[in-house]
């Protein structure tokens, strides 16, 4: 029988050093340390109870749920987002440090679901408020689908370039009851422009001075003629 010859290991310094880039090192360090902020408003959020359990145990992926947006780099939105809750969601997203990511979980979060058909108070898609990285459809999505979405997000983080992480400063979007979005100032103060939320009617826009612009009294006969 022929003897198996093992190659001699090269123990030189050249093969003992791992070379990488700062960008890849930063991406690798964040792959297994995602700290999610769980934002649930409806029935899809109950699936997180299964994820926390021993069967799926999403702690093995390095996920550490946080209750403060300033300590989270991932927000999972699950359930219907209403007009009244939209300012709170935008403010939570703004308080998260960069780089930050968003997973939209469930049909109600992605498109508004069945509630957006005849409802004036439902936001038709959370991507109208904040940028979404991974869409997770379902009503509700299974825990396996949530894990798959997290895996896809980790692959996206691994391919990121540092320059792409610096997102352009886009204006914050405000909404009206007719689902029209306007660019407004920063919402860090928590005070939204009420004029955009509740636009004045056409009659209220006319100032009272227009009704009394005549210095001298005018008779009704002169106005008709």
Curated annotation (Swiss-Prot):
Topological relation to the membrane, as annotated: Peripheral membrane protein
Protein's name in the database: NAD(P)H-quinone oxidoreductase subunit K, chloroplastic
Catalytic activity annotation: a plastoquinone + NADH + (n+1) H(+)(in) = a plastoquinol + NAD(+) + n H(+)(out); a plastoquinone + NADPH + (n+1) H(+)(in) = a plastoquinol + NADP(+) + n H(+)(out)
Cofactor note: Binds 1 [4Fe-4S] cluster.
One GO-annotated biological process of the protein: aerobic respiration
Source superkingdom: Eukaryota
Location relative to the cell: Plastid, Chloroplast thylakoid membrane
Major localization class: plastid
Function according to Swiss-Prot or TrEMBL: NDH shuttles electrons from NAD(P)H:plastoquinone, via FMN and iron-sulfur (Fe-S) centers, to quinones in the photosynthetic chain and possibly in a chloroplast respiratory chain. The immediate electron acceptor for the enzyme in this species is believed to be plastoquinone. Couples the redox reaction to proton translocation, and thus conserves the redox energy in a proton gradient.
GO molecular function terms attached to this record: 4 iron, 4 sulfur cluster binding; iron ion binding; NADH dehydrogenase (ubiquinone) activity; quinone binding
Residues reported in the UniProt entry to bind [4Fe-4S] cluster: 43-44, 108, 139
Cellular component, GO annotation: chloroplast thylakoid membrane; respiratory chain complex I
Keywords: 4Fe-4S, Chloroplast, Iron, Iron-sulfur, Membrane, Metal-binding, NAD, NADP, Plastid, Plastoquinone, Quinone, Thylakoid, Translocase, Transport
PANTHER family on file: NADH DEHYDROGENASE, NADH DEHYDROGENASE [UBIQUINONE] IRON-SULFUR PROTEIN 7, MITOCHONDRIAL
Assembly, per entry: NDH is composed of at least 16 different subunits, 5 of which are encoded in the nucleus.
Entries under PROSITE patterns matching the protein: COMPLEX1_20K (PS01150)
EC number annotated for this UniProt entry: 7.1.1.-
Entry's family note: Belongs to the complex I 20 kDa subunit family.
Cofactor(s) demanded: [4Fe-4S] cluster
């Amino acid at each position: 029988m022929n003897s198996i010859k093992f190659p001699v290991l090269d123990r030189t310094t050249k093969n003992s050093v791992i070379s990488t880039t700062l960008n890849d090192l930063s991406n690798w360090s964040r792959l297994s340390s995602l700290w999610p902020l769980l934002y649930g408003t409806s029935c899809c959020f109950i699936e997180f109870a299964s994820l926390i359990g021993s069967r799926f145990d999403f702690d093995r992926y390095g996920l550490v749920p946080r209750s403060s947006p300033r300590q989270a780099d991932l927000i999972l939105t699950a359930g219907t987002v209403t007009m009244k809750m939209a300012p709170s969601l935008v403010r939570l997203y703004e308080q998260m440090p960069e780089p930050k990511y968003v997973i939209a979980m469930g049909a109600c979060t992605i498109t508004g679901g069945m509630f957006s058909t005849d409802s004036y108070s439902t936001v038709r898609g959370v991507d109208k408020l904040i940028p979404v990285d991974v869409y997770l459809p379902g009503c509700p999505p299974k825990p396996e689908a949530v894990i798959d979405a997290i895996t896809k997000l980790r692959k996206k983080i691994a391919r990121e370039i540092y320059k792409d992480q610096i997102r352009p400063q886009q204006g914050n979007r405000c909404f009206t009851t007719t689902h029209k979005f306007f660019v407004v100032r920063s919402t860090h103060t928590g005070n939204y422009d009420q004029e955009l939320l509740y636009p004045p009617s056409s009659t209220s826009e006319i100032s009272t001075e227009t009704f009394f612009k005549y210095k001298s009294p005018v008779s009704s006969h002169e106005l008709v003629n």
